[in-house]
Amino acid sequence: EKIMHDGGDPVAFDHDCREGICGSCSMFINGQPHGPDRGVTTCQLHMRKFKDGDTIYIEPFRSRAFPIIKDLVVDRTAFDRIQQAGGYISINTSGNTLDANTIPIEKESADKAFDAATCIGCGACVATCKNSSAMLFVSAKVSQFALLPQGKVEATDRVLNMVKQMDLEGFGNCTNTGACHVECPKGISLDYIAKLNTEYA
């Protein structure tokens, strides 16, 4: 209120969905990615999680690969470039939904692929990692395709290209501290990092 009263610009922050599905609301709240509640993003955090009169500290995510644009807004387009390096399949769907069920997929594989695909690319994994590693993000994006038969065609190129792009973007190396999994609002499992390493070998 004081900033606006003094004629300054309001504090800039990203937001979009208000449903915890886009990841654009990412920020530190009292030193924790997305705040003190587990399994939710900033936009889903309720003020009742804090006591009346509490001082709340908000900060942008910090990583060399996520430069600050203004105030709480960071540039997370490095994730987009990693996706562009291999986050696709080349099967021609041509809008023919009749073919959707022609490739049988085991339920366990489909469920794991779906779980990996729930990654919203918010960057909490990078922001909380002492190395600023994007390994959890990349492993989720690699695994969502690697677990399905449609993703097998580009499997080798996908993992090589996405890991290479991750390195080019300046993300750190994974040292298996597990902080990324703990702070991930979608609970992406460290098992996907193991899957990525298997695909990379």
List the model feature ranges, each with a label:
Residues 24-78:
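A generic, well-ordered mixed alpha/beta core segment in the N-terminal half of proteins
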Residues 13-17, 35, 137:
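Short, surface-exposed helix-loop/turn micro-motifs enriched in polar/charged residues
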Residues 1-30:
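A basic, amphipathic helix-loop patch mediating RNA/tRNA/ribosome contacts
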Residues 1-9, 59-201:
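Ferredoxin-type iron-sulfur electron-transfer modules in oxidoreductases and energy-metabolism complexes
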Residues 22, 27-30, 48, 124, ...:
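Mature cores of small secreted peptide/protein domains
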